[in-house]
Regions:
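Interfacial helix-loop-helix hairpins and adjacent transmembrane helices
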Residues: 1-28, 408-463, 481, 728, ...
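Extracytoplasmic
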Residues: 66, 156-292, 525, 538, ...
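Hydrophobic, glycine/alanine-rich multi-pass transmembrane helices and their short helix-loop junctions
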Residues: 285, 371-413, 418-421, 659-662, ...
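Interfacial segments of transmembrane alpha-helices in multi-pass membrane proteins
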Residues: 269-320, 386-390, 650-698, 764
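Alpha-helical transmembrane helix bundles of large polytopic membrane transport and channel proteins
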Residues: 99-208, 214, 250, 539-577
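Hydrophobic transmembrane alpha-helices
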Residues: 286, 302-303, 319-340, 382, ...
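Solvent-exposed, non-transmembrane loop/terminal regulatory segments of multi-pass membrane proteins
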Residues: 23, 38-88, 94-95, 99, ...
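Pore- and gate-forming transmembrane helices of large, multi-pass membrane proteins
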Residues: 271-273, 299, 338, 351-387, ...
């Protein structure tokens, strides 16, 4: 088996170099064909990127948005100079509200618009009697009378007295305005509609008039749109809202859809930007520290591999998602190591060993090791498939495909390019193993074998310590903190929250399970009681609620009187006379679904998750109905739950899969364990460092663990396999570890710098969401690589003194090299 593999690598080395021109031509065609696959890449931005299609939350949200629409844009109109909201309803103001709402409704992707004028028109419909009726036939009057009758039936004297007094005052105010002057152009009538008998904004209107100096317009987008389509619709709605110009007011329009679109736009362009920065940094590192001929060749090799990777992703249907922005710099950082190792090994064979067959030697020695570390990475990335988040799993597939493509490129292209180069112009130079980088790696690994046991004890302590502090590391779950606080959208969101107390929505819908209408008394009673109960139970999250039931219930909410649920027939009548946009946002046309919309206060997804849990736990709807929380807040909390659900398990699965692979491939428990020890050290020490530095983790750290496992085991496996190779040459353990360090030191240090730079570049992002992820992974990778260079050598020495490392690996004859015909005086260099 061993000789067969050696013959294969020799054959590859000879023929790739001998036919370098043909290899280059085939490679170009192959790159063009695979590169075309990049044009087939799609950016997945729907909610199916965050939630699994078989998740109940996903299915409920799809149904909810089909019924009641998608995200809401909030347009806040703030009066200035001591003016109050009633001053908005001049003929000019009414015309402006009408024009802006009509233009917004005409935007493709907008489902409906409820302006302050719409809310007042609805109130007017409730106050005014039907054609041919009297004031006692008006819906508002009926609801007040019914509330008094309920108090009378209950014998509640205090409520009766309070309701009588309120009804008298209300009637007096209304009757003071002649019937023909009860129109929205009459300032006195507008004041009657807006203000209750105590002079405050009527409770039923608070969702649209939070106080007497602010009015709110809600633009509802179509449901189940992608982020791109949502963004286009939001842009159109914002453009319409810019025409909401009323003298003496300040207008602000914002919403979650604008924030998501902004993040999405950044991520699309950001991947190339960060990738470009990573390329520039890596080029600088190679120029300054990688003292070889054609020192930028590894970068070219990995860029070809990246083209293959993204092209394959396009052909395989692997989508790009919000997480994949990390893909390009990560693949560059990890993948360039392969090309650096191959390049350095070839020059080592030429310059130091003066091998008659340097390309074959390099291919035989490093080729199998590169395959091992590639499988290390593949198994680490396959662990990401355990994630409950679709876009994280897609990222795992992208990395898996990418690392395989980069490995192939890093073997084929250097063997061909450097093979023909060494054939035509052999490299000459001094022994680089005595250089600064080689000496540094020898020094890092110079601890004696006797240090192995203390190191093992310290490693265990560090790992345990990291496990203890890990739960204390804060995970940033407030979406507004995922982006730069200088972002205009964030400033608008915070401004809106400061003005009206909330900036987002939490939707809850009650649906019939038997196809019957929900405009029944049991359901109306339940919705009324549930709405108020959840507001009281979650005061830190929920600001107010609006629904067709809440509107009528709030009309009868009188100080000093016990709340009374409205009659179902009255609620049905109110919905029948409501403007179309209010109808579509509060109930389905057939009455089998009712919507409750809570305005939520600023806060984290964790805060909202607690409210969602409370709603689910307290539901207990009437028979024949089901209550379901939904909307963006629920999608966000579902995403958070999925991310946190197996955050630690992803890392442990990556460790377990890589360990099992190494156990099989290296045929030794000791060799497999040695490869994994630095990973555990790095995990614990990095966690402690992150905790001590106070770095807040972002949700993207879900993929950080497997990335660190892949990077660290790549280095530990290369060190271990090179050590065994030197032992096979007859060197004693100490000499073998020193030769390994000195000869591979340059490649390891340069590789370490490029790997760290690749992920550290992400920390230069303007998005804290990415910046903290980049810091998290860069710190872990740096510590992991340092652990591999410091901790692994003494452990290897200690174990090999007991013949646990080299056992079974030193026997067997090598296959002869392939002889190559002379060409000038450098024929042997080709081989």
């Amino acid at each position: 088996m061993r000789q067969g593999m050696q013959r294969f690598w020799s054959w590859m080395a000879v023929n790739l170099g001998r036919h370098a021109g043909l290899v280059g031509l085939i490679g170009l065609i192959f790159t063009l064909v695979l590169g075309f696959g990049i044009t087939r890449l799609e950016f997945a931005t729907g909610q199916d990127s965050y939630l699994n299609s078989d998740d109940v939350v996903y299915q409920d949200n799809v149904q909810y948005q089909e019924l009641f629409g998608g995200q809401a844009l909030l347009t806040v109109v703030a009066t200035e100079g001591g003016a109050t909201v009633d001053s908005l309803f001049t003929p000019e103001g009414i015309a402006t509200f009408t024009k802006v709402a009509d233009r917004a409704r005409a935007v493709e992707g907008v489902r409906g618009v409820i302006s302050p004028l719409t809310a007042l028109q609805f109130s007017n419909s409730l106050i005014q009697p039907p054609a041919g009726g009297t004031v006692f036939d008006a819906i508002a009057t009926k609801s007040l009378v019914q509330a008094k009758e309920a108090a009378t039936a209950a014998g509640d004297a205090a409520s009766i007295e309070a309701r009588d007094a309120d009804l008298v005052t209300t009637s007096t105010r209304l009757l003071a305005i002649p019937q023909d002057q009860q129109v929205l152009t009459n300032p006195e009538y507008v004041k009657f509609l807006l203000y209750d008998n105590e002079g405050g904004i009527r409770k039923a209107l608070k969702p649209f008039f939070p106080d007497d100096t602010h009015a709110l317009m809600i633009t509802r987008l179509d449901g189940n749109l992608s982020i791109e389509a949502e963004g286009v619709a939001a842009d159109g709605a914002v453009a319409a809202a810019k025409e909401l110009v009323i003298p003496g007011t300040q207008v602000t329009t914002t919403g979650a859809s604008l924030l998501l679109q902004d993040i999405n736009d950044y991520l699309k362009g950001g991947m190339l930007t960060l990738g470009g920065i990573a390329v520039a940094v890596m080029a600088a590192i190679l120029i300054l520290f990688f003292n070889v001929r054609w020192r930028l060749l590894p970068l070219a090799v990995v860029l070809i591999g990246v083209i293959w990777a993204f092209g394959l992703a396009g052909y395989l249907g692997i989508p790009l998602t919000l997480v994949t922005i990390a893909g390009l710099p990560v693949m560059l950082g990890i993948g360039v190591d392969y090309a650096i190792q191959m390049h350095s090994r070839i020059e080592e064979e030429v310059i130091i060993d003066h091998s008659p067959h340097p390309i074959q030697e390099a291919a035989r020695g490093l080729g199998p090791a590169l395959l091992v570390v590639t499988f290390d990475a593949v198994f680490a990335f396959l662990a990401i498939q355990l994630s409950k988040v679709p876009m994280v799993r897609d990222f795992g597939w992208l990395l898996t495909v990418g690392i395989i493509a980069i490995c192939v490129s890093s073997i084929v292209n250097p063997l061909a390019a450097l093979g023909i180069r060494e054939f035509r112009s052999p490299t000459k130079g001094r022994n680089f193993s005595e250089g600064r980088l080689g000496r540094l790696v020898v020094w890092l690994g110079s601890l004696p074998a006797g240090a192995a046991i203390p190191l093992a004890v310290v490693s265990i302590a560090v790992f345990v310590g990291g496990s203890i502090v890990e739960p204390s590391i804060k995970l940033e779950t407030d979406p507004t903190n995922w982006v730069s606080q200088d972002n205009p959208i964030i400033k608008d969101l915070r401004s809106v929250a400061d003005q009206i107390g909330g900036d987002a929505e939490l939707g809850v819908f009650v649906k019939s399970t038997d196809g019957q209408t929900l405009f029944t008394q049991p359901v109306v009673d339940y919705v009324d009681e549930f709405t108020d109960r959840e507001l009281a139970a979650n005061p830190d999250v929920l600001l107010n609620a609006t629904s067709i039931v809440a509107t009528i219930s709030d009309l009868t909410d009188i100080p000093g009187a016990k709340p009374v649920a409205p009659e179902a027939a009255t609620v049905q009548s109110a919905w029948d006379v409501a403007p179309a946009d209010i109808q579509t946002s509060t109930a389905s046309p057939d009455g089998t679904a009712l919507n409750i919309i809570y305005l939520t206060k600023p806060g984290s997804l964790e805060d909202r998750a607690r409210a969602v849990t409370s709603i689910r736990d307290d539901a207990n709807p009437p028979q024949g109905t089901e209550l379901v929380p939904s909307g963006l807040a629920v999608v966000g909390t579902g995403l958070l739950e999925n991310l946190e659900g197996n955050l630690v398990q992803l890392t442990w699965l990556a460790v377990g899969l890589v360990f099992l692979f190494l156990l099989v491939r290296l045929r030794s428990l000791t060799r497999a364990l040695l490869s994994m020890v630095p990973v555990l050290v790095a995990s614990g020490l990095a966690t402690i460092a992150i905790f001590a530095l106070g770095i807040e983790l972002s949700p993207m750290t879900a993929v950080g663990g497997p990335l660190v496992v892949a990077t660290c085991t790549e280095f530990t496996s290369l060190i271990l396999l090179r050590y065994i190779e030197e032992r096979r040459r007859g060197l004693e353990p100490r000499a073998a570890i020193d030769i390994t360090a000195s000869r591979t030191g340059r490649a390891f240090i340069v590789s370490a710098m490029t790997a760290i730079a690749g992920v550290a570049v992400i920390s230069t992002s303007s998005l804290p969401l990415l910046r903290n992820f980049g810091l998290f992974v860069a710190i872990k990778v740096a510590i992991a690589l340092l652990a591999a260079l410091v901790v692994l050598p003494p452990l290897i020495l200690w174990a090999d003194r007991r013949n646990w490392v080299s056992k079974g690996m030193l026997d067997g004859e090598d296959a002869p090299f392939i002889d190559v015909a002379d060409h000038a005086d450098s024929a042997n260099a080709l081989s």
